[in-house]
């Protein structure tokens, strides 16, 4: 029996590898065809737009082909996702979370602050929290907390916190993809928002977590190629500045440029940066879309290996993105510094007309407007401009502008646009699926006493997907929020509302009352601090507000536990089974 099982497993893995090779070859051939069109002189606009649209079509097709009506596939990808691919997919989700703060990768340290918090949180999620979820057999972090604290009030609170943070991430991912499609291909914003919303639904709707994870793995591959190809091309032509990362000469110069342009914010001091690290790490460690890859693996060991793979690939692709941003900043500065405002590269005027680059503090449509804007700042006609007078909007623009600034061709521009769009779709679909799981499984199934029909649960899931996708579409069209604000808010909600209760879950004296007090205290502390802060525009402000919620919620929960009855046999038994017991400690879900 064991030999037959091993042979069957080997056959299934071979079939899986063959399918992955086919998908990878399809993407590579499509991108190679775009490069060929660029070489033979096809219109630049067509060559630059073809790869992004193919990427959207390819990811949507991949998600649709994985459709299933089985609960085990829809909610957990059949518990059959190999660790290497699960980690690769999770890297795409985490990288998309980092894109709104992408300039910090090239312009600041990784050890502390928002970037450091992301890596610490990913390590905690991948090496401990995720494997714990997989060991216990739950579908999400909210289900684990609901099993530990069983009152209806705490269940509603946990499900609401997961749904809110996941919805914010879905909107952020959609906005990242829409912005890339609009800014780098010139697409109409309404059309781009509709296309991204439809693609997100097609990926997450038919196949659930299976479609989301495999699409995210493909997105990670596209991102590796998209960010890595320009760096490789510059290296082959000996045009890549040395020391682009880790404090080299070019890295230091790029960091100064980014700071002078205002692309990277001014540091707020070591205490604030340290607080940001803690809050962001706790937010990542308890974020449902980040933990979803662990749920889809074979067992706890596979989940831990997936965490290691996710950390490795996140670092690798983040290094490529940091090098690309730094190279783009240096190329842009060298192309424009010393030039009069009426003789800047045409690409700068085009970007300024779309609001992506300011010239002398103004958005201009051509040389004459640039000359007038600089004259208002005291520049004489024909006087050369300082590099600080040409200010890009953000790090995403610098990523997309590298091929033009370094004259790598339209195909490279399309490849980077594809990478940004693919990462945005990975985050959007992961957020959609996590929110739908919270409502369709954690709420509808568990709260109804585990008696609901699978078909009804999946129907509720898909209705939730449509509602959240519609909200993301409206957010993308109106442009009311920025991706950075949405991601920071999601991390703050997750850290303030879930982290204290997760810590209490390991304390035998904590019961339903303590969890409810911690949950409510975290929410009150977070939203009160946000109200005092007004309209926060930096992730550090959201992190400080989250830390206020964590402190209040954790403190109240601890105080309540110390004043409660110390002997809680049920809590002690649950913790013992959770940490030292066999896997699948919860009653298995029917269909799973």
Where are the predicted features?
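Hydrophobic alpha-helical segments and their helix-loop junctions in multi-pass secondary transporters
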Residues: 29-38, 62-68, 167-170, 174, ...
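Transmembrane helix-loop boundary segments of multi-pass membrane transporters
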Residues: 37-50, 104-114, 174-192, 210-219, ...
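Terminal cytosolic tails of multi-pass membrane transporters
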Residues: 1-21, 65-67, 336-364, 369-375, ...
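Membrane-interface helix-loop-helix modules in multi-pass membrane proteins
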Residues: 71-138, 280-283, 302-334, 344-376, ...
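Loop-to-transmembrane helix boundary motifs in multi-pass membrane proteins
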Residues: 15, 148-156, 163-167, 316, ...
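C-terminal membrane-solvent junction of multi-pass transporters and transport-like membrane proteins
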Residues: 13, 70-87, 487-592
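Helix-loop-helix module between adjacent transmembrane segments
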Residues: 10-30, 110-205, 275-283, 289-292, ...
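Membrane-interface loop-to-helix entry segments
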Residues: 13-25, 43-72, 78, 139-167, ...
């Amino acid at each position: 029996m064991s030999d037959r099982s091993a042979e069957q497993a080997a056959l299934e893995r071979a079939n899986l590898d063959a399918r992955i090779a086919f998908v990878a070859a399809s993407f590579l051939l499509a991108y190679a065809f775009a490069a060929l069109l660029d070489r033979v002189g096809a219109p630049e606009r067509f060559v630059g737009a073809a790869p992004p649209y193919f990427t959207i079509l390819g990811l949507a097709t991949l998600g649709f082909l994985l459709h299933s009506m089985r609960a085990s596939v829809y909610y957990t990808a059949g518990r059959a996702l190999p660790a290497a691919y699960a980690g690769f997919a999770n890297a795409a989700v985490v990288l998309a979370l980092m894109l709104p703060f992408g300039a910090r990768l090239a312009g600041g340290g990784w050890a502390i602050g928002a970037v450091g918090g992301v890596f610490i949180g990913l390590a905690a999620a991948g090496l401990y929290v995720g494997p714990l979820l997989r060991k216990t057999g739950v579908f999400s972090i909210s289900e684990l907390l609901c099993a530990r604290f069983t009152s209806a009030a705490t269940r509603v609170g946990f499900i609401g916190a997961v749904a809110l943070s996941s919805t914010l991430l879905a909107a952020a991912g959609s906005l990242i993809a829409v912005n890339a499609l609009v800014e780098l291909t010139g697409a109409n914003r309404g059309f781009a928002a509709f296309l991204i919303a439809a693609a997100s639904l097609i990926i997450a709707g038919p196949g659930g977590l299976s479609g989301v994870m495999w699409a995210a793995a493909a997105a990670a591959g596209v991102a590796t190629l998209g960010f890595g190809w320009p760096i490789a091309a510059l290296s082959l032509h000996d045009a890549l500045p040395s020391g682009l990362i880790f404090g080299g000469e070019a890295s230091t110069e790029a960091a100064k440029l980014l700071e002078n342009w205002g692309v990277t914010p001014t540091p707020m001091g070591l205490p604030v940066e340290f607080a940001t690290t803690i809050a962001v790490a706790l937010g990542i460690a308890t974020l449902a879309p980040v933990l979803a890859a662990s749920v889809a693996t074979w067992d706890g060991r596979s989940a831990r290996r997936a965490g290691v793979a996710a950390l490795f690939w996140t670092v690798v692709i983040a290094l490529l993105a940091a090098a690309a941003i730094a190279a783009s900043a240096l190329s842009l500065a060298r192309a424009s510094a010393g030039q009069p405002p009426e003789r800047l590269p045409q690409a700068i005027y085009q970007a300024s007309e779309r609001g992506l680059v300011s010239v002398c503090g103004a958005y201009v449509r051509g040389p004459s407007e640039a000359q007038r804007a600089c004259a208002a700042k005291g520049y004489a006609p024909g006087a050369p401009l300082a590099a600080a007078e040409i200010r890009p909007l953000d790090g995403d623009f610098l990523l997309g502008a590298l091929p033009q600034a370094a004259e790598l061709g339209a195909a490279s521009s399309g490849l980077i646009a594809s990478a940004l769009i693919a990462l945005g779709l990975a985050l959007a679909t992961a957020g959609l699926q996590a929110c739908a799981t919270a409502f369709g499984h954690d709420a509808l199934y568990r709260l109804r006493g585990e008696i609901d029909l699978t078909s009804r649960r999946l129907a509720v899931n898909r209705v939730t997907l449509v509602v959240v996708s519609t909200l993301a579409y409206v957010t993308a069209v109106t442009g009311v929020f920025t991706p950075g604000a949405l991601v920071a808010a999601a991390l703050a909600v997750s850290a303030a509302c879930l982290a204290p209760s997760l810590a209490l879950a390991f304390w035998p004296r904590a019961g339903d009352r303590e969890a409810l007090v911690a949950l409510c205290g975290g929410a009150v502390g977070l939203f009160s601090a946000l109200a005092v802060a007004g309209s926060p525009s930096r992730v550090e402000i959201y992190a400080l507000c989250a830390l206020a919620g964590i402190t209040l919620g954790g403190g109240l929960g601890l105080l309540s536990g110390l004043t409660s009855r110390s002997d809680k046999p049920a809590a002690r038994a649950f913790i013992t089974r959770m940490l030292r017991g066999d896997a699948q400690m919860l009653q298995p879900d029917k269909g799973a």
